[in-house]
Regions:
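Glycine- and small/polar-enriched repetitive beta-structure motifs of secreted/surface proteins
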Residues: 1-386
Length: 386
């Protein structure tokens, strides 16, 4: 062999035709015979290498078991120690990729990063103990202290941030970006969490999307939810199929399902109400268990709590309503109605003074505008019945 450098007892001692090797340390590259282009620094580094070429090993026992693996870079005590035939791996840090045997194209930076990986390929791990329990899970990216720490066979996960996807084991296709995002997720798949503690309590809930500070924070098994905004769906645990956009929107929802909410503080107090639509600042804000309500507009249906079947479209339409089965369309339509039920009001300030009157119909500008407690009234036209 030509252009070899060996420093230390038994270093490169069996080399026959290998070229351009550098071996520094007791028994480093001791069993290499024909391999070339290796750099080995440290006691027993690349000790068992025979034909593996173009490897770099720096540190005690780094790449110790490598036999035919090529183009690996190992820096740190016991980094890539058990690698035998794996190629194109990079391990930087104490015990980085220590147990890897055949896995390829992995990058591990940090103490114990990808420690337990054996045959999995295409993982990237940056941070103390990130992906350290991973064995055969492939195509994962973990950046941050203990990110994806407990992952074993889960695949195609992306975790960026301290303890993001911390205890995930077999869940796949998850994206967690932010401190503790999806921290408690174990087996659930296809979740996306972006923001501090977003979906951080989720265990088995699938296909949720949470974007924002503490969005869907306590969700555990709820599925198919979308929460965008600070504290959106923060209290949701098992509620499913909710779509929420806006700061504090639906922040108290626990088990309510099939709701659509858009606007700051809209649907804020809802806990178990289902199949509601709230669009606008404070729309349906006080609703707790009411179902089947539609509120579109600033403060629309703001005070309804437990009743359902109401439709309010317009600025402060049905704002004070606590009854059911009312329909109000227009600016201030039925604004002060409280317990009146089964009314239909369409037009600017139509039925605007109604409080407890029921079964009325008002169509037109200011229609029935003076009615307060009367029942079974009908008015059609400009200021009709006013």
């Amino acid at each position: 062999g030509n252009f070899n450098t060996a420093v230390g007892r038994s270093a490169l001692s069996t080399n026959t035709t290998g070229d351009n090797n550098v071996s520094v340390g007791y028994s480093s590259l001791q069993n290499s015979t024909t391999s070339s282009g290796n750099t080995s620094v440290g006691m027993e580094s690349m000790f068992l290498n025979t034909t593996g070429a173009n490897n770099t090993a720096i540190g005690l026992c780094s790449l110790r078991a490598n036999t035919t693996g090529t183009a690996n870079s190992s820096i740190g005590r016991h980094s890539l120690r058990d690698n035998t035939t794996g190629n194109c791996n990079t391990g930087l840090g104490h015990n980085a990729l220590r147990n890897n045997t055949e896995g390829e194209f992995n990058t591990a930076i940090g103490n114990n990063a990808l420690l337990s990986n054996t045959t999995a390929d295409n993982n990237t791990s940056v941070g103390f103990e990130s992906l350290c329990a991973n064995t055969t899970g492939a195509n994962n990216t973990a950046v941050g202290f203990e990110s994806l720490k407990g992952n074993t066979t889960g695949q195609s996960n992306t975790a960026v941030g301290r303890t993001s996807l911390l205890v995930n084991t077999t869940g796949s296709d998850n994206i967690a970006i932010g401190l503790s995002a999806l921290r408690c997720n174990t087996t659930a798949s296809k979740n996306t969490a972006v923001g501090f503690c977003a979906l951080c309590s989720n265990t088995t809930g699938v296909e949720n999307t949470a974007v924002g500070h503490e969005a869907l924070k306590v969700n555990t098994t709820g599925n198919y939810n979308t929460a965008i905004g600070r504290y959106t769906l923060q209290a949701n645990t098992t509620g499913c199929n909710n779509t929420v956009l806006g700061t504090f929107a639906s922040g108290s929802n626990t088990t309510g399902c099939d709701n659509v909410v858009v606007g700051y503080n809209s649907f804020a107090d809802n806990t178990t109400g289902c199949r509601n639509i709230a669009v606008g600042y404070n729309a349906l804000a006080d609703n707790t268990t009411g179902f089947g309500n539609i509120a579109i507009g600033y403060d629309a249906l703001r005070l309804v709590t437990t009743n359902g079947g109401n439709v309010a479209v317009g600025y402060v339409a049905l704002e004070d309503n606590t009854a059911e089965n009312n329909t109000a369309v227009g600016y201030c339509a039925m604004r002060v109605t409280t317990s009146g039920a089964d009314n239909v009001s369409m037009g600017y300030k139509s039925l605007k003074a109604n409080t407890t009157g029921g079964k009325g119909s008002a169509f037109g500008y200011h229609a029935l505008c003076a009615n307060t407690t009367g029942n079974d009234n009908n008015a059609f036209g400009f200021e009709a019945g006013c």
